[in-house]
């Protein structure tokens, strides 16, 4: 029994070690070398584990080779509106299709843009990495350039999405406050499902589906495969107007009559729950 307990202890220790190493490698892949090193050295007895010793040495070497990006004013910014999930419905000849063609991008186009940026050496940075407030000696506040350290040849870029409200004209053909199959082929709201940000989407048959139907979950999907496209966990910056609600939640007073008091109250509760649930773990900025 003693030997068996020791054996189980060794197995658990090895599993913990592997978990720490995987976490540290992920942090280093996103250029957060200090946190990667801290993850390794925070493991009890790391000095006696060759894999962890080597990982620490590798992270220190990568940190030493990183170069500070010289001029934050040259960092490009690319932005998108809500992405088109169903082109057949978006470009069906109605008066809205001209605007969609001019101002929107499809999911396929967005994914192609991400892949192109990645292949050209761009790395997504948080807008607060570019510059931040610094209190001056006289008590005033001044925005100063941030310190972004990347491997030679890598270039920072800021990504944002505008109007993340999923307006009625895009999703709700009968204006009853609920998305339907007569919509123009866009996601209808953001929500958390199974612990992940995802989108609700009503397809042409009227089925309510959940998945990567807009920028936020699509970007997460890409970063799952390419963690080195994100600088220290950076995501996109998203903006809302508040017109007809936010993130697809109809919380403006105009919808009290359309939805009824109970449904309207639930929509408001869902919206608050959505924003609060993810506030501590998301890098999206409003």
Language-model regions, residue ranges each:
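Metal-dependent polysaccharide deacetylase catalytic core of the NodB/CE4 family, i.e.
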Residues: 73-93, 137-143, 150-157, 164-286
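TPR/TPR-like alpha-solenoid helical repeat scaffolds
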Residues: 50-66
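Single conserved hydrophobic/aromatic residue that forms the stacking wall/gate
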Residues: 1-12, 276, 284-286
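C-terminal domain-boundary segment and adjacent tail
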Residues: 106-145, 263
């Amino acid at each position: 029994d003693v030997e068996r307990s020791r054996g189980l202890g060794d197995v658990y220790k090895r599993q913990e070690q592997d978990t720490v190493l995987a976490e540290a490698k992920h942090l280093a892949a996103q250029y957060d070398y200090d946190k990667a090193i801290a993850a390794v050295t925070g493991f009890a007895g790391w000095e006696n584990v060759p894999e962890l010793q080597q990982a620490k040495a590798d992270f220190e070497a990568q940190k030493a080779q990183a170069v500070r990006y010289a001029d934050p004013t040259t960092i490009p910014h690319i932005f998108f509106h809500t992405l088109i999930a169903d082109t057949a419905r978006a470009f069906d000849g109605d008066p809205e299709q001209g605007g969609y063609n001019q101002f929107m991008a499809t999911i396929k186009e967005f994914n192609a843009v991400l892949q192109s940026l990645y292949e050209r050496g761009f790395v997504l940075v948080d807008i607060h990495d570019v510059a931040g407030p610094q209190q001056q000696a006289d008590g005033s506040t001044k925005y100063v350039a941030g310190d972004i350290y990347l491997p030679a040849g890598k270039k920072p870029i800021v990504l944002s999405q505008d109007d993340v409200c999923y307006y009625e004209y895009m999703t709700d053909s009968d204006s009853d406050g609920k998305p339907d199959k007569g919509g123009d082929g866009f996601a209808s709201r953001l929500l958390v499902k199974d612990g992940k940000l995802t989108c609700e989407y009503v397809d042409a048959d009227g089925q309510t589906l959940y998945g990567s139907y807009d920028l936020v979950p699509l970007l997460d999907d890409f970063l799952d495969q390419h963690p080195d496209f994100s600088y220290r966990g950076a995501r996109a910056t998203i903006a809302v107007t508040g017109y007809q609600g936010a993130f697809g939640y109809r919380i403006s007073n105009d919808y009290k009559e359309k939805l009824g008091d109970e449904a309207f109250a639930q929509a408001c509760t869902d919206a608050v729950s959505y924003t609060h649930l993810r506030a501590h773990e998301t890098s999206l900025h409003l």
